[in-house]
Amino acid sequence: MEVFGDNKMFYMRDTWREGTMICDVLPINPSSNGVWPQQKFSDPNINVHFWNYAFPHLQMIFLIISFLWQFLHFFLRRLGMIRFTSHMLTGVLLSKSFLKENSAARRFFSTEDYKEIVFSLTAACSYMMFWFLMGVKMDTGLIRTTGRKAITIGLSSVLLSTLVCSVIFFGNLRDVGTKNSDHTLNSLEYVVIYSIQCLSSFPVVGNLLFELRLQNSELGRLAISSAVISDFSTSILASVLIFMKELKDEQTRLGSVFIGDVIAGNRPLMRAGIVVLFVCIAIYVFRPLMFYIIKQTPSGRPVKAIYLSTIIVMVSGSAILANWCKQSIFMGPFILGLAVPHGPPLGSAIIQKYESAIFGTFLPFFIASSSTEIDISALFGWEGLNGIILIMVTSFVVKFIFTTVPALFYGMPMEDCFALSLIMSFKGIFELGAYALAYQRGSVRPETFTVACLYITLNSAIIPPILRYLYDPSRMYAGYEKRNMQHLKPNSELRILSCIYRTDDISPMINLLEAICPSRESPVATYVLHLMELVGQANPIFISHKLQTRRTEETSYSNNVLVSFEKFRKDFYGSVFVSTYTALSMPDTMHGDICMLALNNTTSLILLPFHQTWSADGSALISNNNMIRNLNKSVLDVAPCSVGVFVYRSSSGRKNISSGRKTINGTVPNLSSYNICMIFLGGKDDREAVTLATRMARDPRINITIVRLITTDEKARENTVWDKMLDDELLRDVKSNTLVDIFYSEKAIEDAAETSSLLRSMVSDFDMFIVGRGNGRTSVFTEGLEEWSEFKELGIIGDLLTSQDFNCQASVLVIQQQQLMI
């Protein structure tokens, strides 16, 4: 039946597909003429509304899916679940299980008409771009630097697990049923299930660690390295198996395989050769082309849009080529993604341009559209259900064991081994895509696909909350020994971790390190860590410039830091030892890099720049970086040693401790003294601050004044008897120390108002203040002031000194003594 419109431009026709009438519109017009329906035919029942067109329909589905998964995630994240679980549940809600056949909602989300082409193409492009972006984020250098532990765990968790499952499968095949019928699983389905169950994909593991904020932890780095090894080994194995299967089918078709048929018939050997040629082109042509684009991009300028568009066209072509070569559609884009240099400027430009749209909109659409074939009602009475559950549980247990055993062999704690096994057993978008591809090609039946999707949903819902409970990243930063300045042996080496966030932090940090008075008798070993935000790659990078473990182009990230601290080392040759590092990671996990480096090098002090910077005269606020503030607070919470937060103010009227001299032994007769005041209220943080001030007093050009606040309040004294005894003992040693010249005074204070007045009267007399943080410690000197504090990380006294009301132009160093110990 054909119905022509008045303009003769299109018609509607009825076609039959398996007994179902499908109305099609020719020629296909993907976009409508507007929201309001227009009368085109005499019969109003055949009018075409705007939602009957492909693109408006697709946009409405995007909107519904985005709303649903974000609504679900709003509640599920409070249970410790990640976004992928919300994506899967959205797909389940829109599947056959909940949308009944022939209902209006089912017809709206159905693709059984001309819109199927648009929907399928959109889902395929989403999956293709996801793998390309994961390739861009992935650091291929991680493979070269992977240790034996990660290689052993990666190979064992995948290859050995698959081998053992194969033995179990063939050995117990008769017990679980092997007849090829509509009611039981066939052998191909078993192979597909346990093969996918034994995999560990880098994108899946990386996304899980990112959402749990574990990628910077020791466990996270090990899991990422193991997943990379697993990915590459399984990719090579899968390519070989696909090639062998194609070759076997070709041999069956021809009776033999020879060169003539290969060349003339476009068969498996030719496809394999094209795949190898494509990899070589990606390495030796595409990657140099990417470096050419980087070279053509001026420093600080964005990458030209034409370059990015050309890359995306090449990615689409690689997906088509991979599909033609009988490989997975993501193989080509993933290889091209690996060939793109990660990080700025090109890698980060690609990520910034496409990541939000792909991960926020298109990827949920792919997951939801892949899950629409889930039909829970088909499982009732299905005889193969027990068999598929058995093989899934068996595969999980085998993989869990073969991940745990190698980890135990390398001496990892039992809890960490279990956590690592759960991470490697996590299932995500890769497994969903693999099952969807198998279902599309007829390798698994609808019931098997339904169970597999439900298992992935259950797996993603259970494992993340267990990991949050089982593994605490802060626990690994706790030490067995006291790592602070107060308990260091006299004249022993002081190890300091100096953090650099901005180039403006370099000079103040060097100035502070000089004030600590390094000498040959009591040297200072400083570990300089330049922290940069991770953009354009998935796995964090940690560069040791001393070992030169990274490529030369990556060391340019920290060139200013390297040059400045190398000069500092030469100026204090024999008294200062410098090791410089660069860490590229997400802001939420940067504290892991800081704490791990401090733990590995047994430092006694971590120096952190304050998140605010001021003008040259110290009066005007220039920048206020909340990301740095959150990072500092995270370090204060989990640091394995003492921590100092340095609030630097450079005033033209103030003196610079390093001005006029190049070495610690050199003296300048006309050099003005540098006045430092230590405000002592009592407690372990203040005792740590006194220890640092005493060390600074060894420099004859630094005048140290210790002002102790005392009170006659008996109640306050009774509540801190033990602390007061330790305070008195330390201060007695300081006053009796004849090697340093320290001015000591005591001020009687009755309440917080007098404390504030005293500090206000002192701010113009000193160049720097040193105070203890005193976190959680109540004192009559500060009672009532805490509720007015703006920066809790500075403590009450430190916050007062940095507040605008005080008009203090002196620098402030806030000290917190080591808190975490096992």
UniProtKB/Swiss-Prot annotation:
Gene3D superfamilies the record matches: 1.20.1530.20
UniProt keyword Metal-binding present: no
UniProt cross-references to InterPro entries, sorted A to Z: Cation/H_exchanger_TM (IPR006153), CPA2_transporter (IPR050794), Na+/solute_symporter_sf (IPR038770)
Record keywords: Antiport, Ion transport, Membrane, Potassium, Potassium transport, Transmembrane, Transmembrane helix, Transport
Gene Ontology terms: cellular component: membrane
Similarity comment: Belongs to the monovalent cation:proton antiporter 2 (CPA2) transporter (TC 2.A.37) family. CHX (TC 2.A.37.4) subfamily.
Molecular function terms from GO: antiporter activity
GO BP term, pick one: potassium ion transport
Name of the molecule in the record: Cation/H(+) antiporter 3
Disulfide bonds: none
Entry's localization field: Membrane
One Pfam family from the record: CHX17_2nd
Domain of life of the organism encoding this protein: Eukaryota
Gene from which the chain derives: CHX3
Presence of the UniProt keyword Ion transport in the record: yes
Classification of source organism: Eukaryota, Viridiplantae, Streptophyta, Embryophyta, Tracheophyta
TM regions (residue ranges): 55-75, 116-136, 150-170, 190-210, 224-244, 274-294, 305-325, 331-351, 362-382, 388-408, 418-438, 447-467
Biological source species: Arabidopsis thaliana
PANTHER family the record matches: CATION/H + ANTIPORTER (PTHR32468), CATION_H(+) ANTIPORTER 3 (PTHR32468:SF118)
Protein's membrane topology: Multi-pass membrane protein
Protein role: May operate as a cation/H(+) antiporter.
